[in-house]
Design a protein with these regions (language model features):
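NAD(P)H dinucleotide-binding glycine-rich loop of Rossmann-like/cofactor-binding domains
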Residues: 81, 90-152
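A short acidic, Gly/Pro-enriched loop at the edge of an enzyme's catalytic core
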Residues: 202-209
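Glycine-rich phosphate-binding loop and adjacent beta-alpha segment
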Residues: 218-296, 332
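C-terminal hydrophobic helical "lid"/dimerization subdomain
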Residues: 279-333
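Mid-domain Rossmann-like dinucleotide-binding core that forms the NAD(H)/NADP(H) cofactor-binding site
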Residues: 126-197
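Glycine-rich beta-strand-centered segment in the early N-terminal region that forms part
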Residues: 22-39, 52-97
Length: 333
């Protein structure tokens, strides 16, 4: 089959190539999926750059990509939830990445029937951003009436998170560029801060939750607007100190994580708030929940642009440019 493989770390043009590789061999708990569409996420170009070498070690070359939608070709003897012909969508784990390909074999617990009312391209846009939001909100026990600040509301995660937060009954503030103000309001944002018209730090705060999708200075600055007793949950900041313990990391990695996160923890202590970082895990049950939200009209996938399969390097570069409104999708079939 054809698949894009990562053969080293660095520039996209130098290390992402289309190759002929062996078809995946599914195990007894796996489903073999013919991929019709895959979506891109920032973690993909960060992986290419080598940003994740400390926390995710891969033997290269190897296929990569996390999100996919397609048709089940076969199911293992114990993969009784699915049958050939089922239209499904899935999120691969760190160990099973490889959705920028014509086929993938995944454990059945990573897979769900795709929402019935949408296309494969729209379904492929949902898994990582949807699971990230559901798992993140569950971890901080988000509930109706709380005030949440969602950074980058027009991005892939932001467009899903705004809709899901509104579904739960949270009071939603988001940041975006002035050209996207009406767009994020249409998704359900109560208040919008246009970052090209003013500094969000000067717009007040006292948020119960800050959902940090940007990292860098935004992670530390989040503690200037979160309320005492609140929580900053980050997808892009440094790993929290529990991460190394959860991963069973050695002392060298634990020291590295401590050094990476020291500024964040200092800001957290000063603000009297909690810092939470996590890596999303595949979850077919939650994908079924998301499918119900989509079919019920609570969530609508947002696609900025679709690229042909052979254009993955261009699609990664486009996403890395930071101007996508919603998700970038790869049409495999």
């Amino acid at each position: 089959m054809r698949a894009f493989v990562l053969d080293g770390y660095g520039a996209i043009a130098d290390h992402v190539r289309l190759a002929e590789i062996a078809d995946p061999v599914p195990g007894p708990d796996d489903v073999l999926i013919e991929i019709h569409a895959a979506s891109l996420n920032p973690i993909d170009f960060k992986l290419v750059r080598g940003d994740l070498k400390r926390v995710s070690k891969y033997q290269l070359p190897r296929p990569f990509g996390f999100d996919a939608a397609g048709i089940v070709l076969s199911a293992g003897a114990r993969a009784i939830r699915f049958k050939p012909g089922d239209a499904v969508y899935a999120r691969a784990s760190r160990e099973t990445i490889g959705t920028f390909a014509e086929k993938i074999a995944l454990p059945q617990e990573f897979v769900a029937l795709k929402p019935a009312a949408i296309s494969h391209a729209e379904a492929a846009a949902l898994p990582l951003v949807g699971l990230t939001t559901l798992q993140g909100f569950a971890r901080v026990k988000a509930q109706a009436g709380q005030r949440i600040l969602i950074h980058a509301g027009a991005g892939g995660i932001g467009t899903f998170a705004i809709q899901y937060a509104r579904h739960l009954g949270l009071d939603v503030t988001t940041t975006t560029s002035s050209k996207n103000v009406d767009f994020v309001k249409s998704l359900g944002a109560d208040r919008v801060i246009a970052y090209d018209r003013g500094n969000y730090l000067e717009q007040g705060g006292d948020y119960d939750i800050v959902y940090d999708t940007l990292g860098g200075a935004f992670t530390v600055d989040a503690f200037k607007v979160v309320k005492r007793g609140g929580v900053v949950i980050s997808l892009s900041g440094p790993p929290d100190r529990d991460f190394a313990r959860r991963e069973g990391a050695g002392w060298l990695v634990r020291v590295a994580v401590w050094l990476m996160s020291r500024k964040v923890y200092a800001a957290s202590a000063e603000a009297g708030a909690t810092y939470c970082w996590f890596f999303t895990e595949p979850n077919g049950d939650q994908l079924r929940e998301i499918a119900g939200l989509v079919d019920g009209g609570a969530i609508k996938p947002v696609i900025d642009r679709e690229f042909a399969f052979e254009q993955l390097p261009a699609a990664l570069s486009y996403l890395e440019g930071g101007r996508a409104r919603g998700k970038v999708v790869l049409k495999v079939r």
